[in-house]
Structures are given as C-alpha cells and as structure tokens.
Amino acid sequence: MKFVLLFGVFLVTLFSYSSAEMLDDFDQADEDELLSLIEKEEARAKECTPRFYDCSHDRHSCCRSELFKDVCTCFYPEGGDNEVCTCQQPKHLKYMEKAADKAKKFGGKIKRWFG
C-alpha cells in the first residue's frame, strides 16, 4: 500500500513539473507572437494615408482620428471621367467625436465642481 501511495505521489509530481514546463513554453511563445504582432502594427501604422490624400492605391490605409478610422471615399469630380478616392471622415462620425469631446470637457467641469 505504501508503495502505491509513493508511486502515486511520484507520478503527480512528475506530471505537475512537466505541465509547468509546457505552460512556460506556451507563455514564451505567446509573448513572442505578441511582440511580433506589435512590431507589425507599428510598421503598418507608419504607412497610413492622411485625411484628404489619395487612397486609391490602398483603400484600407486611411489613418485613424481620435476615436474612429477615416474611410476611403471615392467619387467622380464634376465633368471628369476619372474616379478620385480620398480619405475622409463621415459626417456622423465627425459629430460623434465632437459630442464625445464636449462630454469629456463637461465631465472635467463636474469633477472640479464636486471633486
């Protein structure tokens, strides 16, 4: 009976040790993957197209504003046959950003009043 108990404790110890090593390996792999994703994101962030610039080469390359990403909008200028695409902010998102900015300012005033 003692032999079975000692053998069981040995197996549990061995299993927990191997599980801990596997978890460490997974954590290290997750960290490496996260770092590579962050590096790619930083590299991609430098190549965004500013507002009102031509985005016909890549319609998903528009920069972000404070809260929302700008949208590549295409149109035909009056009297022209060529399509022109520029990064623009839709009006409803523009109004939402203004409302959020005013709410932040109002929240700051309330903090000062009751702070």
Swiss-Prot record:
Protein's cellular compartments: Secreted
Record carries keyword rRNA-binding: no
InterPro entries noted in UniProt: Spider_toxin_CSTX_knottin, Spider_toxin_CSTX_Knottin_CS
UniProt KW keywords: Disulfide bond, Knottin, Secreted, Signal, Toxin
Signal peptide region: 1-20
Tree of life domain: Eukaryota
Propeptide span(s): 21-44
Principal location class: secreted
GO molecular-function term, one example from the UniProt record: toxin activity
Intrachain disulfide bonds: C48-C63, C55-C72, C62-C87, C74-C85
Tissue specificity comment: Expressed by the venom gland.
Keyword field contains Ribosomal protein: no
GO cellular component: extracellular region
Family: Belongs to the neurotoxin 19 (CSTX) family. 01 subfamily.
Record comment regarding domains: The presence of a 'disulfide through disulfide knot' structurally defines this protein as a knottin.
Protein name as it appears in the record: U3-lycotoxin-Ls1h
Species lineage: Eukaryota, Metazoa, Ecdysozoa, Arthropoda, Chelicerata
